[in-house]
Amino acid sequence: DSGRYKDGGFYRVVRPDNDNGDPAISVIQGGLLDTTELQAEDLVPHETTDQTGIKHTDGVLSLARRDPGTGSGGIFFICVGDQPSLDYGGKRNEDGQGFASFGRVVSGMEVVRKINAIKETRAVDDPYMRNQILVEPVVIKNAYRKDD
């Protein structure tokens, strides 16, 4: 609601052909491009898909994280296709807690798929993200919550 994603971007694409994790997933990741803007209050308590009932299906938005409770409102991803390994009990994280999903793309999935198909990536130090960080982030012009 604060408009903080305006001028943010999508900077990471993960597909089975470039995924360095197991099991392979397909997502685009984005949010704030300047992560120095992240604050401690941006951390979001972890809610599993078992608690919310929002499974990682095509177009679902979810918080990126390392450990539970380290997800930030400043960094999120969008599922491209169904990604059950990201749900509670899924095998993508050793802790089995999955990722905290919180919304869904209501229009524009064709754009999400085009972003996910971008092949031009840059070198990074983190081997987990090798071949996934875009040379040029795709800018978010606007993002907002749609009321029912």
What annotation goes with each model-predicted range?
Residues 1-148:
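Cyclophilin-like peptidyl-prolyl cis-trans isomerases
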